[in-house]
Amino acid sequence: RTRRRRRDDLRYFRNHSRHAALAYAHAVMAGPTPPYMGALPIVVNDKVDFWVHYFKTSGRGMFMRWLVRGESIKPLVQPLLQDSGVPLEFFYLAMIESGLSNSANSRARAMGTWQFMRGTAKLYGLKINHWVDERRDPIKSTLAAAEYLKELYNDLGDWYLAMAAYNAGPGRVRRAVRVSGSSDFWKLCETRDLAKETKEYVPKVLAAVLLAADPEAHGFNVHATEAPEVADVTVKVRKPVRLDELANRLGVSLKTLRGWNPEL
């Protein structure tokens, strides 16, 4: 087991060095990533710059789709984060989690925009049964995610560690802090105490924040692309009704109605 771990560690550091070299080459050719002036301090280093470069090149098409999707739900989600005391930049954590798709699901059975596992979702008040899965409700799942993120921040005392804990779980991050003796995420990245996925997760989120702050400057012409329509009115239904009947009364297609209510 020790020999296998050493091989894995060696492979990680080789890959990390390769990534750092690519990021450095990109920085030399393209110039430094512009400073970010938002509410959450954004560190720009070789790890972040690697993902900036990736999203502008190999991952460009995917990131463009995320940006377009984000135009439709950002007005719904960001005010909820702000009102909950969570930095607006955490909107882009959801982008990395799911591509901002409420229908996203993982092999681990995480679901929705914020990729909640069933147990965590229920712990934070989301309803899951035969008829509804509120992990796919962009408003309710955002409120639950904001509550969870605030608890992680209050527990760990740092927003970067809260991001890492959202990915790895708070227990693993607390253990990494205890074993390493450091609460600096970037110093934890230099140890074996965090998984490679978590070490890359926070830089991905930060890269998304930087690119989305001024997408046109990075060649993403988001406003020229039509964003999907999102309903902004809530109507209470007082008795059971078939969705196709309700869609007919509203004068919309069943597909549109389901798109407005992805939790159903």
Give, region by region, the residue ranges found by the protein language model.
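Substrate-binding clefts and substrate-entry loops adjacent to catalytic sites
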Residues: 51-65, 100-110, 115-157, 179-192
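Export/targeting segments at the very N-terminus of extracytoplasmic proteins
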Residues: 59-99, 143-152, 235
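Solvent-exposed loop/turn segments at secondary-structure junctions
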Residues: 98-101, 120-123, 169-172, 212, ...
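Catalytic and binding regions of secreted/periplasmic enzymes and modules that target cell-wall glycans
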Residues: 150-178
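Catalytic cores of secreted or luminal carbohydrate-active enzymes
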Residues: 196-217
